[in-house]
């Protein structure tokens, strides 16, 4: 009964418009004061232990910073040019190229909203200019942008790993095949639609242009090799990889592509050495750091408050009670996965993915292990649910971002995204009930998962 009161408090605060993070934290603290023997001092200790013990969480601000430099520094337009050169000549080629571009940018950013902004701000206008409807373009980008949290490196995967003590490296590998499969399913759906509606296709630009586009995009795409190669080559940890990614992104944006900073100013005739020094204090660098800082603070504030709720649930032994009741009821793996999907699909409509994972993952993880479900399989399934949550109202973040980028009303974006959500639901069913899609690559490259019960 007391736990029901806690969730009523959380949901009630959200309904009256209290920000999600404050709803989680304030309701948990009020519950502690009224119904629990735990003290507020224990909350502070739990928060300290959570952040001190999860070195992995340090990767989040660095991945966000890398993503911001990549978005600002002209990487997106070079990736789009490369994607159009490769697949633009198919029927519906611009839409297909936008999905390919989202997949490639997802491998650099780890963030869905960043992918929508970076790719959508360029591609949507281009698609409309070439005969596509704005609704079609917005729907494709809104859904393809969700690949930002599925294709590694992914900020949401880092949060899941921190919440469940699962290897980040395994999670990243687990997202490769599902990410490619999701992109392929969207591409097939677009191609079929393009054939039916006779959508336009671009002329083949020739291999010379394709190679030139590949060369220009290679500096940005090399970041994927550095991150994943460094992690699986044992050169650095995921957190160190994130820091390297941030530095590399800064270097590429300022000194190679020269789309920001003093080198972007063609009228600046100062010596090269002076420009290099100015880069570190230039207004573009400051603006990028500010944007990354704002996003990091917002995300970490949500995670911190979600950790308070997690602490309360742990103090009240809720995970153990749920595990015992489900197992005693004879709940099998298939039924359990259906229940988890339903919880996440509903929760994902109202909460930011990272905060929801911090709360739900520790609750369902012990049950999954007891039922013999692979932690990587569970994690990827949860991430896919978060993808769908980002494109469903009322709080789907990608819907709001797409609305701003495409300059469309929220309701029109929801209608535009709806047909493609069906593809994502089909993909969720595949990921849920075909475990090897998520587990094959991690097992192949890192051996079988060792689980300590």
Swiss-Prot record:
Pfam families: DctM. GO terms for cellular component: plasma membrane. The chain crosses the membrane at residues 2-22, 50-70, 82-102, 104-124, 139-159, 172-192, 217-237, 243-263, 289-309, 326-346, 356-376, 380-400, 417-437. InterPro entries: DctM, TRAP_DctM. One of its GO terms (molecular function) is transmembrane transporter activity. It is a multi-pass membrane protein. Part of the tripartite ATP-independent periplasmic (TRAP) transport system DctPQM involved in C4-dicarboxylates uptake. This is C4-dicarboxylate TRAP transporter large permease protein DctM.
